Amino acid sequence: MDTTRGLYLSAAGLAIAVLLTAAPGRLPAQQTAAVAIDGDDIGGAVRSPSGPEAGVWVIAETAELPTKYAKMVVTDEQGRYVIPDLPTANYSVWVRGYGLVDSPKVRAKPGQQLDLTAVPAPDARAAAHYYPAIYWYTMMKIPPAKDFGGTSDIPKNITLETWRHRMNNTDCIGCHQLGQESTRTIPAQLGQFKTGAEAWGRRIGSGQTGEFMMNRLAVQLGGVPFKYFGDWTDRVARGELPRHKPPRPQGIERNVVVTSWEWGTEKTFVHDLISSDRRYPTVNAYGPLYGSPEYSSDDMPILDPKTHTATSFRMPVADPNAPESFGPPFHATAAMKPMQPSPYWGEEKIWSQRANNHNGMFDRKGRVWFAAAVRGIENPAFCRKGSDHPSAKVFPLDRSGRQVSMLDPRTMKYSFIDTCFGTHHPQFGYDADDTVWLSGSGPVAGWVNTKVWDETGDAVRAQGWAPFVLDTSGNGKVDEWTEPGQPAQPGKDTRLAGSGPYAVMPHPTDGSVWYTFNVFVGPPGFLRFDPKSKLSEFYAIPKDGIGVRGGDIDKNGVLWGSGSNGTLISFDRRKCKGPLSGPTATGTHCPEGFAYHKYPGPGFEGFENTSAEASYYTWVDHHNTVGLGENVPISTANLQDGFVALKDGQMILLRVPYPMGFFAKGLDGRIDDPSAGWKGRGLWGTNGDRTPWLMEGGKGAKPRAVHIQVRPSPLAK
């Protein structure tokens, strides 16, 4: 908004609105009072034959900027809207909402009063087309309890809880938005099949992840998911519709402003983005966003939201002979070549990379640190047995699939920090050494002392690692331990194993580091690591919680995680009543520390009191970067096209209504201008679905970076 231009409510402006009334999609201006706008806003009212349409979206999109750009707002109780602060361009504007079909697109410019006609859906099927994926996904059936335990084709080791875990936030749902139109239907290009189960058996063998997907469903789950996925899509094809209808945005949800930009390419995905230092959220104010394309490309997307320009940076590796990071032992979920032809890309190899950049994090100096490969998988000698490195003496490491790199945006210098431990998510601690802690480190906690790195450039000296050891001896120090799977022995500690640390969460005040632990293999839960004693504490998710994926820690030390039971799981160590170390403190000793906060959205049949929301990651807004207040946990709402925040005990859905299929794997907050109110802050995320061609727009659609802001009212400009 340019406040120097004043309110654009002149008679001339109103006259323009009147002249436009003959065009499809517009209402006569006299039917509603003009809303207050500036010269860089578009505003008006939305009505249908039933009257004002409250809680629907008005979307403005343009292709006249360097990259495709869209802005979306929600109407107030009188159907009024204001789309603020639009760059100069011609826009297509239309209405989208539950109970409606998209209105005809109308051409408009900033500074224009524009009343719009909403189009009621002619039938239930047309209305359901716009429902979030969760409403369609929950039409799929879950096997009955009697089919588990070896009584059916479901492998005996798979329990009902395991099945729900894998349907809710791992397996297919961890990479794709199941329930969107492209997944609830079978593409014609795939071929003709006798049954839906047969079609799914062919479908998941497609592309460079076909082998991985086939192994998960056909081998580990005995091929039974094909039956349930096939039955689901068969019923959809016959015209069956969701049992539930979504509510329109209410209250604070109507104050949300969403801005999106295309970036990346139509063949690659952007796993995550970073905008600032979560400890100091004014770092990189108004600056570029840096994306992580993981194993789809070495071309890191960069978005400048001020100039609306999307570029890329080619991420190198230190070893010019390093192989591509595909297939075991590099990356088990993708292969060099498609297993079977893709219905979209045929036999083309669309992904190619060596850096495998998974996630980035800003430091307070404005540099970006990445969990990225710098070499092949075999570790150098200083990591291995016989090395004099202090960490290697305790626990030598032979391999790491991904290490650490750093980009200084001021010079575009790219540095390699060769770590012995693997990496996945980086997060800076609150210590004087600006230690960056990494997850994805397998059996150890891994860290890089960035102060030492800055002073010496010596990656060997700057890094350290330690195994996860429970103090089951109870003496407050690391002793001889029993190995994973061995029976406990009096006087010995216990080493933990499994899939290891996933999310990493340095405590803001006490120096400890927390992780979500064993997301994929082993008992899932939260793990606390003490950098001073090198001891760990483990708190297993109770059975009714099923599991956890991404998580974060709030300013009070409470843990928050995306639960596999359709809830936001919290854990407060301060509520534990029993001892936190000793022979009984092995994971199940503090159920009283856990609480569950149900996500919005329906559950599967038979689990109606739950939500099927497949949240991938949770982040806590320490600094009110979004506009909902400090210390607010926010989860990705992967089946509802956006994010969901827990504020004052209420779930607030922050939906990205266009293009449908928004599926984030992380989120970040930034304050661009602390004195600019809601306009100077916002939440950042990107569409992280591995297959952008499955979202609205189809083949050719690119990932979108989004900026979500919460203004004081739906008409704030």
Mark where each language-model region is.
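A short, solvent-exposed loop/turn motif at the edges and junctions
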Residues: 62-68, 90-109
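The canonical Cys-X-X-Cys-His
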Residues: 169-180
